[in-house]
UniProtKB/Swiss-Prot annotation:
One of its GO terms (cellular component) is cytoplasm. Component of the BCR(KLHL20) E3 ubiquitin ligase complex, at least composed of cul3, klhl20 and rbx1. This is Kelch-like protein 20. It comes from Xenopus laevis (African clawed frog). The keyword Transport applies. Residues 63-130 form the BTB domain. The lineage of its organism: Eukaryota, Metazoa, Chordata, Craniata, Vertebrata. Keywords: Cytoplasm, Kelch repeat, Nucleus, Protein transport, Repeat, Transport, Ubl conjugation pathway. Pathway: Protein modification; protein ubiquitination. The keyword Transmembrane helix does not apply. Residues 165-267 form the BACK domain. It comes from the Eukaryota.
């Protein structure tokens, strides 16, 4: 070994080393070469260590505890169980008798569920499914395995349906899963018209029925539906529930009924007529309806109109370029609340991303992450507010790519791969999780906009790598061929494109010299483009989408500033008007519109 100091004859290395340790033991004196260092962290070590420990468990080697669950004996290591479960840590490190026992009996837990959880402790893997979730969640709660509790709740969220939401709600309540309980409550309220017809609804105890019908957000067309649901519930087990009718009826908002229904249906029902408290509630409602001048003095929970959260289309703005870098953030605009809210971000930053909606799922294709061109694809599920990356990648990297859906396939059109501008077109089959090449365009196009109309896929404008284009091509999937159609009046790259009132609108973008505010539209019946009134702002890299019948231009770049503002086109007044703004400024982001069929947007 090299000495740390030059020594005189007779000096020993030990003496010298002792001098070296004076002061900082890790620092050699000045002038002495510092030893080379290479910190090393193994990614394999944790996994390989667990694998070996799991093999020891399976061979019953070095095991120091046996868990007895019913008729099952499970061999394990206390240190592993204690590291994974606060329940076992308290058991084995405290003064409990179990800390000294080699066999420990675990009660009130399913054998198979315990096996799965012990396996998870050794492997980090578990499969939650319909057949085990009802035993797995209670077991995870007992062992205080929060990660598995969350996984079970996430699984149950995805299974929510009008036929089972009440059962899931009760299950969540029993096991104190507050988030799952909240989501099940919201789902029940939003889908009450279907829920009230389910067997689970008829089996509800009175207190849970009252909880549901007391909500201001109960989604019903009229209070008649609530009354009918209550009476159906009572008559399902009339002898047992008849005494509970007055208590439940207090939470039906009888003053909101029409006079005809109140008198003709409610007041004449034998169950109502035979109970004094019920008759009093009907009389209260009659007075409210017949004496409008007295209504200010009669306000209360039963006179408060319900305010259900209505469902509709929701606009998503995905990725883009902001503050000098590509971004992964995603936000959504709900016209019902007139609010932009952040949702789950993508796993990658993506500018020049292609976005479209297939089977109520939002796809983000390719783009550029600030340093690399991407061929990866992500898929967003609005029901769970989660992105997944298990979608097959495109055959080549693509940014400034056009993406649209036609005939159940997701098409990726043109773009650039970092080397050249592309005319390549491929389509994704979600059933096969596979991309397949189709006929290429006649022209290379980056910054191209795409739209689907009349069974055809249109590729509008873009740049051939040298200059912006005004040319347009149309793809016929039956022939697998592209055909050239009438060109636009203006050359545009990085434009926005959407189908509105059976015509293709092309807005903004950039020509040879500047960002554009102009707009035009294509009539397929005449094969002609005609000008449309210009937007209030120049917008290159703009997103264009139709949301609940409104044409909206989203974000972009005006030549000076990245934009977060929105404009809406009014075809009657032939004007664009500003319509608020996003949370983030976005250039080259994608937009997509999803119909929220069960009001998922208000669940998470």
């Amino acid at each position: 070994m090299r000495r740390c100091l030059n020594t005189r004859p007779g000096e020993t290395g030990m003496d010298v080393t002792s001098r070296c340790t004076l002061g900082d033991p890790n620092k050699l004196p000045e002038g002495v070469p510092q030893p080379a260092r290479m910190p090393y962290v193994s990614d394999k070590h944790p996994r390989q260590t667990l694998e070996v420990i799991n093999l020891l468990r399976k061979h019953r080697e070095l095991c120091d505890v046996v868990l007895v669950v019913g008729a099952k004996k499970i061999y394990a290591h206390r240190v592993i169980l204690s590291a994974c479960s606060p329940y076992f840590r308290a058991m084995f490190t405290g003064e409990l008798a179990e800390s000294r026992q080699t066999e420990v009996v675990i009660r009130d837990i399913d054998e198979r569920a315990m096996e799965l959880l012990i396996d998870f402790s050794y492997t980090s893997q578990i499969t939650v499914e319909e057949g085990n979730v009802q035993t797995l969640l209670p077991a995870a709660c007992l062992l205080q395995l929060a990660e598995i509790q969350e996984a079970c709740c996430e699984f149950l969220k995805r299974q929510l349906d009008p036929s089972n939401c009440l059962g899931i709600r009760a299950f969540a309540d029993t096991h104190s899963c507050r988030e799952l309980l909240r989501i099940a409550d919201k789902f029940t309220q939003h889908n009450f018209q279907e829920v009230m017809e389910s067997e689970e609804f008829m089996l509800l105890p009175a207190n849970q029925l009252i909880d549901i019908i007391s909500s201001d957000e109960l989604n019903v067309r009229s209070e008649e539906q609530v009354f009918n649901a209550v009476m159906a519930w009572v008559k399902y087990s009339i002898q047992e529930r008849r005494p509970q009718l007055p208590q439940v009826l207090q939470h039906v908002r009888l003053p909101l009924l029409s006079p005809k229904f109140l008198v003709g249906t409610v007041g004449s029902d034998p169950l109502i007529k035979s109970d004094e408290e019920c008759r009093d509630l009907v009389d209260e409602a009659k007075n409210y309806l017949l004496l409008p001048q007295e209504r200010p003095l009669m306000q209360g929970p039963r006179t408060r109109p319900r305010k259900p959260i209505r469902c509709g289309e929701v606009l998503f703005a995905v990725g883009g370029w902001c503050s000098g870098d590509a971004i992964s953030s995603v936000e959504r605009y709900d016209p019902q609340t007139n609010e932009w809210r952040m949702v789950a971000s993508m796993s990658k930053r993506r500018c020049g991303v292609g976005v479209s909606v297939l089977d109520d799922l939002l796809y983000a294709v390719g783009g550029h992450d600030g340093s690399s061109y991407l061929n990866s694809v992500e898929r967003y599920d609005p029901k769970t507010n989660q992105w997944s990356s298990d979608v097959a990648p495109t055959s080549t990297c693509r940014t400034s790519v056009g993406v649209a859906v036609l005939g159940g396939y997701l098409y990726a059109v043109g773009g650039q791969d970092g080397v050249s501008c592309l005319n390549i077109v491929e389509r994704y089959d979600p059933k096969e999780n596979k991309w397949t090449r189709v006929a290429s365009m006649s022209t290379r196009r980056l910054g191209v906009a795409v739209a689907v109309l009349g069974g055809f896929l249109y590729a509008v404008g873009g740049s051939d790598g040298t200059s912006p284009l005004n040319t347009v091509e149309r793809y016929n999937p039956q022939e697998n061929r592209w055909h050239t159609i009438a060109p636009m009046g203006t050359r545009r790259k990085h434009l926005g494109c959407a189908v509105y009132q059976d015509m293709i609108y092309a807005v903004g973008g950039r020509d040879d010299t500047t960002e554009l505010s102009s707009a035009e539209r294509y009539n397929p019946r005449t094969n002609q483009w005609s000008p449309v009134v210009a937007m209030t702002s120049r917008r290159s890299g703009v997103g264009l989408a139709v949301v609940n019948g409104q044409l909206m231009a989203v974000g972009g770049f005006d030549g000076t500033t990245y934009l977060k503002t929105i404009e809406v086109f009014d075809p009657d007044a032939n004007t664009w008007r500003l319509y608020g703004g996003m949370n983030y400024r976005r250039l080259g982001g994608g937009v997509g519109v999803i119909k929220m069929t069960h009001c998922e947007s208000h669940i998470w």
